[in-house]
Regions:
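Flexible N-lobe loop architecture of eukaryotic-like protein kinase catalytic domains
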Residues: 16, 56, 65-68, 90, ...
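Conserved N-lobe ATP-binding subsite of Hanks-type protein kinase domains
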Residues: 22
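C-terminal lobe helix-coil module of Hanks-type protein kinase domains
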Residues: 27, 70-73, 86-102, 199-200, ...
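Conserved N-lobe loop of protein kinases adjacent to the ATP-binding glycine-rich P-loop
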Residues: 27-35
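AlphaC helix of the eukaryotic protein kinase fold
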Residues: 41-63
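Activation segment of protein kinases
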Residues: 45-49, 102-180, 222-258, 262
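Conserved catalytic-core element of eukaryotic-like protein kinases
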Residues: 208
């Protein structure tokens, strides 16, 4: 049963539910400000010790202030519920924003500051307009765990030793042409560059996001990418156990680095690996690892090489392919060291 209120926030409606919490559309009782409130608990969904630690870690996140980072308003524990109140962003998640199907005339994303309105500013020569509908609002479920099922288009379990399964069905020439359109690649570079800026800022403060995936990046009506869902963020110097549920590695398997999948300590390079998974997926149309279940996926992340990107999409931008391949190195020491290096590589 949903709480009627959490802390100073009146619960209005459910945005989405996940394995460790629920996200609500809520209103601050005094200011009237709308927010997305992620609620963890009540016990026994999360241990009391972990809940208190979460509240302390979330409180630190209130200091985050960057144009490509969703604002964290406040956090706390209220009647057994740990909660995190964040800026309510309307728009498209990164995957939807870069969908080839959206390269057509349509309204621009909806601003969190203004209701939907007709038209919307467009710049046909640079970033094509994108459509917004109910799915855009549901994209706020980005703050939740995604199911670990094999994405459509991935191969069955059988594959060559040491190499993850290739797509079950090669993409059509039309699909590949759409993936490689200059306008789409322009906004891909722009969006990922902004994500790199956000990561550089977060990492510079000593944080690791730990759950970077396409649905945790929203693009608003200003074509501004916004990194969101800091429910799993931790200080790189602290132990992972602070926000790990019993018997479970927290995060979304498909985008985890090998070290995170093993429950080892992580640093900024783990987030950069996750960014590499995102880039591979956006270039190939499918993720690098397509395991049909968590166990198979775990094995692929730890031991398999992704199918060569140029074998999946021969027309992919070579410079972007090189960036993705370096980010996906199993050994963190062979990846980019800092998000600023990725921004420079994208600009080059």
């Amino acid at each position: 049963v949903a709480p009627r209120a959490v802390g100073p926030y009146e619960i209005l409606s459910v945005i989405g539910r996940g394995g460790i919490g629920t996200v609500y559309r809520a209103r601050h009782r005094e200011s009237g400000q709308l927010a997305a409130v992620k609620v963890l608990g009540p016990a026994p969904a999360i241990e009391a010790t972990a809940a208190r630690r979460l509240a302390r870690e979330f409180e630190v996140l209130r200091s985050l202030d960057h144009p490509n980072v969703v604002r964290v308003y406040e956090a706390g524990v209220s009647e057994g519920y740990s909660f995190l109140a964040m800026e309510l962003v309307r728009g498209l998640d990164l995957r939807a924003y870069l969908s080839p199907a959206l390269d057509r005339e349509a309204p621009s994303p909806t601003s969190p500051r203004e209701p939907s309105s007709a038209g919307g500013h467009t710049d046909p020569g640079t970033i094509p307009p994108v459509a917004v509908g109910p799915a855009a609002i549901r994209a706020l479920a980005a703050m939740l765990d995604e199911p670990e099922t094999a994405p459509e288009g991935c191969a069955p379990p059988e594959s060559s030793p040491g190499i993850a399964p290739a797509p079950a069905q090669p993409a059509s020439p039309e699909t590949l042409e759409a993936l490689n359109r200059p306008a789409r690649l322009f906004r891909l570079r722009a969006a990922l560059g902004q994500v790199a800026d956000a990561l550089a800022y977060v990492h510079g403060l000593g944080f690791v996001h730990r759950d970077l995936k396409p649905s945790n990046v929203m693009v608003d009506d200003d074509r501004r990418a916004r990194l969101m869902d800091f429910g799993l963020v931790k200080l790189a110097s602290e132990r992972d156990e602070s926000i790990t549920l019993q018997g479970r590695v927290v995060g979304t398997y498909r985008y985890m680095s090998p070290e995170q999948a093993q429950g080892l300590p992580v640093d900024a390079r783990s987030d950069l690996y996750s960014l590499g998974v995102i880039l591979y997926e956006l270039l190939a149309g499918v993720p690098p690892f397509c395991g049909p279940d968590a166990a198979r996926l775990w094995q692929e992340i730890l031991h398999a090489r992704p199918p060569p990107l140029l074998s999946v999409n021969p027309g992919a931008d070579p410079a972007l392919v090189r960036i993705a391949e370096r980010l996906l190195e199993k050994d963190p020491d062979r990846r980019f060291r800092r998000a600023e290096e990725i921004r420079a590589a994208l600009a080059g």
